[in-house]
């Protein structure tokens, strides 16, 4: 989808916060030098995540947005204009996602988990570990706040973060993690004080499949061993040695059977549900989803939307 977006439509990019998860959007914005990029950063420390930063506005996000609202309040810009511009695309995209039926894969696992959590009768919080887990969570368009261990590009501490959170609350704490992040931080499960309110869904496809989606790495002879960390490890032994409940799924039927126990079974100790998939199948499903997004973008072209709304949208001018 990113390839089809017309860069000349972007006058300015304003970024707030820290690192940017989506590599596709980063690549899209890095491939244009037409628009300005201003970062809102109280410290003044540059990040230049799109590699053509114009400058930094040294301010807190709240103060900046408040000042922007004050400056533009009388320029006839109204939220309804933007809503009119974006609603057709967003509606079609949401309908597409709801109608998309993924085959057995990591995306299916996360989607089914999120859908099932809408029907539970207890409070809970959701953690997504890092990298692919975070991306899959974002694809589900959850209306709930989610926590993630996304720092720069590290995978360390994902399980420790969720485990520590679970000790500070009686609420159910769910954590969705990839295999590398889980095994890297398995020592978090040594803690004998952990309780049954910690539930970990482990997505195991034998390595870091995100790397196969990056241009160039998919053809590298070294990618499997030295970049994606290919392995043949599972979490059963780790769970047994730490008195952690363990469930496993290798197909759709096993997944749904395990998911019921994962969400409802009362335990005194944490539970891990390990979902085994194949990285090629995982990436195929994501490719299919990308294609659907591209089709939505073509049908609801930004050019047509802009022309229909141009009579009402008055751009800000200093």
Task: Label the model's feature ranges.
Residues 17-21, 43, 131-133, 180, ...:
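Short glycine-rich anion-binding loops that position phosphate/pyrophosphate groups of nucleotides
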Residues 12, 125, 172-174:
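Structural motif
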Residues 21-25, 110, 133-137, 183-186, ...:
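Short, well-ordered alpha-helical microsegments
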Residues 15-17, 40, 128-129, 149, ...:
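Short His-Asn-centered micro-motif
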Residues 10, 53, 123-124, 178, ...:
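Local beta-strand N-terminus motif with an aromatic residue
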Residues 1-86, 192, 214-215, 263, ...:
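Glycine-rich, acidic loop regions that bind phosphate or pyrophosphate groups
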Residues 86-170, 316-317:
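Active-site diphosphate/adenylate-binding microenvironment
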Residues 139-318:
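Thiamine diphosphate
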């Amino acid at each position: 989808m990113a390839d089809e977006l017309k860069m000349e439509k972007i006058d300015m990019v304003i970024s707030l916060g820290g690192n940017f998860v989506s590599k596709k959007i980063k690549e899209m914005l890095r491939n244009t030098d037409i628009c300005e990029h201003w970062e809102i950063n109280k410290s003044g420390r540059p990040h230049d995540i799109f590699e053509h930063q114009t400058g930094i506005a040294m301010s807190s996000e709240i103060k900046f947005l408040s000042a922007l609202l004050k400056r533009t309040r009388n320029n006839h810009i109204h939220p309804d204009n933007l809503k009119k511009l974006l609603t057709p695309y967003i509606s079609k995209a949401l309908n597409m996602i709801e109608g998309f039926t993924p085959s057995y894969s990591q995306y299916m696992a996360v989607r089914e988990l999120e859908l099932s959590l809408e029907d539970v009768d207890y409070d809970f919080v959701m953690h997504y570990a890092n990298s692919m887990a975070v991306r899959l969570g974002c694809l589900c368009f959850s209306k709930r706040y989610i926590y993630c261990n996304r720092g720069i590009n590290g995978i360390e501490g994902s399980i420790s973060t969720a485990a520590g959170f679970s000790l500070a609350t009686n609420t159910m704490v769910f954590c969705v993690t990839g295999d590398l992040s889980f095994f890297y931080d398995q020592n978090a499960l040594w803690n004998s004080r952990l309780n049954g309110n910690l539930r970990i869904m482990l997505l195991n496809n034998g390595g870091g499949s995100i790397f196969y989606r990056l241009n160039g790495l998919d053809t590298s002879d070294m990618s499997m061993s030295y970049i994606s960390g290919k392995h043949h490890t599972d979490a059963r032994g780790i769970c047994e040695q730490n008195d952690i409940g363990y469930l496993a799924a290798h197909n759709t039927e096993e997944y749904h059977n395990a998911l019921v126990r994962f969400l409802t079974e009362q335990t005194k100790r944490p539970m891990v549900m390990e979902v085994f998939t194949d990285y090629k199948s995982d990436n195929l499903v994501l490719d299919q989803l990308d294609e659907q997004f591209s089709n939505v973008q073509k049908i609801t072209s930004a050019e047509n939307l802009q022309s229909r709304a141009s009579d009402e949208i008055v751009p800000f001018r200093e």
